[in-house]
């Protein structure tokens, strides 16, 4: 079935659900597409042995709050293929009831040109993240995804047009604060709600400035 393979299918990279996180981390095409964000999002996850066993399908199906994988793939406008329900956006998939009688078979990542940055805050390097942040820019439109809130990752867009005039220190700070106020955070053993809100604004600002510098 090729469920452990990464294939190029027209305008997409098509990943079987059994592709390991380590395979994604080391894949030249995916890293070139994301300017290294793919490797950055995966390299902190526990250890190489674990990443050789953990799969992209399991990471997405669980819709775990701490998922680095889900955070980045939402920013990439990824799609999923389900055996019964067919193809849908990953963002739509995250809204489905968790008790789905279906099977996730493939993940599709669009090849279109975009800028991507991934950042996370961890108490120690291989721990679950305290907060995750993925930013992408395509055709002048910005997408921000915040995960480990500690709930499941959510997508936030520039609804107020704060970045319409370009990214500067001031606009990056304003957008970071806007996302931090719109996002819903909670407390867990790793961090409190207020701490996560503060970190969110910082990661978004840093990510935007890094993206602007690389662009």
Regions found by a protein language model. Give the residues of each.
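C-terminal structural segment of proteins
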Residues: 1-215
